[in-house]
């Protein structure tokens, strides 16, 4: 072979009847199907040149002006952002707005903390905010709203689900119509409400309405601070009271009711049992 030509004559591509596909073989192999030959070395060389070209472009590109498509709008002087959709608006560096009347505005100089809004009417208007869904609203730093009409309106609040609302700092509302309306509150389940600071409501329509209250179970209800209600339709309605079991009820301060249909009515009362066991003021009832 002559120097410079050997690489172009070592391999070729032929049709393999047994494998029913093209295969790479030695130049010396016979091709029974025809005369067409593809030079592998040339293809590899072309790919190498193309890849090198892409790398050079990426390295040279740097920051680019924000882009608008389909009548979207971008704020002058902002870079690397994107607005797609009629009246979509990207108003800060690297922020992304996709959807009719969506708005993404990180309201921060730091381009590493962009906002992202996706969905008709979605608004993400704080640093590192994310709003995803029809009319989803994430309006404070690091807030996340996912779901139709979901709202996360305080720092680091998280709302996930249709009409879910997290309106306290670091609050979490997960589930359709779930509401966490105080700092560090957690509501998990359809229609749950955690209204007290650091309160927890878990289960369909469970409620925790005071500081550090815990309501777990369908329709569990806690109205006073540090109260605990666990079980379907259980109820804690005094400070520090505990009700555990279906339809159990603790209505006196520091009272404890454990068991189905048990009731602790008075301060410091303890009722343990089933089917209507009741403890009065300071008393203990077991049965």
Spans of model-derived segments:
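Short, Lys/Arg-enriched N-terminal segments with co-localized hydrophobic residues
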Residues: 1-6
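Glycine- and small/polar-enriched repetitive beta-structure motifs of secreted/surface proteins
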Residues: 10, 15-19, 23-30, 37-47, ...
